[in-house]
Curated annotation (Swiss-Prot):
The keyword Oxidoreductase does not apply. The gene is aroQ. The keyword Amino-acid biosynthesis applies. This is 3-dehydroquinate dehydratase. It catalyses: 3-dehydroquinate = 3-dehydroshikimate + H2O.
Length: 146
């Protein structure tokens, strides 16, 4: 049994109401519920945290190492393009992770095209709405099984 940590960055608490034409109508609670069900079906455990505060995400990543977290899925949201500190935290704990985005960041504003995480990630999944998380979790299962 593996434990997978899902981290949701800033403003993702507003999913379902924030710019649904970009992010869809699915809520964060819906996403977490689906991911939990997927983990249970595979015999794994899921933990999730959403924070608008960079330091809370960093502290959670630091704690993950000591807790034996096996894999991280992270949607850094706006921190994707700005947070060297969050990148450094992921590098420091050396837990494999997948970067995940609801929208296709490469078809949006130019400032969203750069990620501080992609070169460290096992992979990047973007552009499939809430399904991006499900695809990331399926990829995490495959990595854990290999």
């Amino acid at each position: 049994m593996a434990t997978i940590l899902v981290l949701h960055g800033p403003n993702l608490n507003l999913l379902g109401t924030r710019e649904p034409e970009i992010y869809g109508a699915t809520t964060l609670a819906d996403i977490n519920s689906t991911l939990t069900e997927m983990c249970i079906a595979k015999g794994h455990h899921l933990q999730a945290l959403q924070s608008n505060a960079e330091y809370e995400l960093i502290n959670r990543i630091h704690d993950a190492k000591g807790e034996g977290i096996n894999f991280i899925i992270i949607n850094p949201a706006a921190f994707t393009h700005t947070s060297v500190a969050l990148r450094d935290a992921l590098a420091a704990v050396d837990i494999p992770f997948i970067e995940c985005h609801l929208s296709n960041v490469h078809t949006r504003e130019a400032f969203r095209h750069h990620s501080y995480f992609s070169d460290l990630a096992q992979g990047v999944i973007c552009g499939f709405g809430a399904q991006s998380y499900e695809l990331a979790l399926q990829a995490a299962f495959a990595k854990l099984d290999s």
